[in-house]
Amino acid sequence: MSRIGKKTIVIPAGVTVTLNGSTATVKGPKGELVKEFNPEITINIEGNEINVSRPTDNKNHRALHGTTRAILNNMVVGVSEGYEKKLELIGVGYRAQKQGDKLVLNVGYSHPVEFVAPKGVDIEVPANTQVIVKGYNKEHVGELAANIRAVRPPEPYKGKGIRYEGEHVRRKEGKTGK
């Protein structure tokens, strides 16, 4: 048995999960998520718990078992609590600001870099060197945060760039002059 797949998912109060064939719909206070799963994996809703089971022990079914359970759990947590990723800008003159629904980054290029948040994802700028990406879909929050970080990933010599909060950047020593 998959150790992750055999765990039950507890549905919190205020969240409803409905199954239509192999499509799961999860509604909660933060929003609604719909996802289609592989029809070979069985999803059962009993009271306020979700159980995921697989037909056989072959490698493909074992992989799908844990993945299906993890995605369903992320959907339930997302619509009830939500997800957030914090990014920090480190470097002289690096700053972020919000203009309407756009995030504008000045990170050392000749032009500012702009991002528009997709539906269901919010961008907050509490300080000009800090960005918070919030939303109920873990996939969209992580993707937008990764795209923002990819504009100027942290470099190993001075540590300048955009990094996740708490991310450790491996530092290198520069060349030694003669």
UniProtKB/Swiss-Prot annotation:
Gene Ontology molecular function: rRNA binding; structural constituent of ribosome
Record region (Disordered): 159-178
Listed GO CC annotations: cytosolic large ribosomal subunit
Keywords, comma-separated and alphabetical: Ribonucleoprotein, Ribosomal protein, RNA-binding, rRNA-binding
GO biological process, one term: cytoplasmic translation
Cross-referenced InterPro entries: Ribosomal_uL6-like, Ribosomal_uL6-like_a/b-dom_sf, Ribosomal_uL6_a/b-dom, Ribosomal_uL6_bac-type, Ribosomal_uL6_CS
Domain of life from the UniProt record: Bacteria
Matching SUPFAM superfamilies: Ribosomal protein L6 (SSF56053)
Gene3D superfamilies, A to Z: Ribosomal protein L6, alpha-beta domain
Summary of subunit composition and partner proteins: Part of the 50S ribosomal subunit.
Family: Belongs to the universal ribosomal protein uL6 family.
Functional description taken from the UniProt entry: This protein binds to the 23S rRNA, and is important in its secondary structure. It is located near the subunit interface in the base of the L7/L12 stalk, and near the tRNA binding site of the peptidyltransferase center.
NCBIfam families named among the record's database cross-references: L6_bact
Entry protein name: Large ribosomal subunit protein uL6
Organism encoding this protein: Listeria monocytogenes serotype 4b (strain CLIP80459)
Taxonomic placement: Bacteria, Bacillati, Bacillota, Bacilli, Bacillales
